[in-house]
Structures are given as structure tokens and as C-alpha cells.
Amino acid sequence: MAAIEVGRVCIKTLGREAGNVCVIVEVLDKNYIVVDGNVKRRRCNVKHVEPTDKKVELEKGASTEEVKLSLDAAGLL
């Protein structure tokens, strides 16, 4: 399993956004992260995402525009 870290590309597995691609923007603690990208920016349980082996370069707390530009440049949007 890939590490839970800022910039890691994930796929939401549960909830109304299940199946959508997202990026970890911030790690809050061992159970919660903040995701953004092809989903609404929100806090998410780490059990509700599946990390992939892909990673984009982002700063902690990057804006939604920066996240979308990084995903588009990586060809993931």
C-alpha cells in the first residue's frame, strides 16, 4: 500500500464521490486527511480512499486551482 502523504493521488472508495480521483492536500492525523481535485475539498477518513502509486508535487494546503493544474499536467483529470 502506498503511503498517506501530501501529493499522493488516491481514489475515493466510499461515499457519493466514490470512484473519483483526488489528491491528499493535508494530513490531519492518523485517521483523517484533506482531499481535493476531482472531488469537493473536504476532510476524509483514510479508510475511505485507496492510495495509488502516483504522486504530484504539491505544497501542504495547496489551493484547489493548484491541485487541478497538477492533476491536469500529470494527465489524471
Curated annotation (Swiss-Prot):
One of its GO terms (biological process) is ribosomal large subunit biogenesis. GO terms for cellular component: cytosolic large ribosomal subunit. GO terms for molecular function: RNA binding; structural constituent of ribosome. The keyword Oxidoreductase does not apply. Keywords: Ribonucleoprotein, Ribosomal protein. InterPro entries: Rib_uL2_dom2 (IPR014722), Ribosomal_eL14 (IPR039660), Ribosomal_eL14_arc (IPR023651), Ribosomal_eL14_KOW (IPR041985), Translation_prot_SH3-like_sf (IPR008991). SUPFAM superfamilies: Translation proteins SH3-like domain. It comes from the Archaea. Gene3D superfamilies: 2.30.30.30. Belongs to the eukaryotic ribosomal protein eL14 family. NCBIfam families: PRK04333.1 (NF003320). This is Large ribosomal subunit protein eL14. It comes from Methanococcus vannielii (strain ATCC 35089 / DSM 1224 / JCM 13029 / OCM 148 / SB).
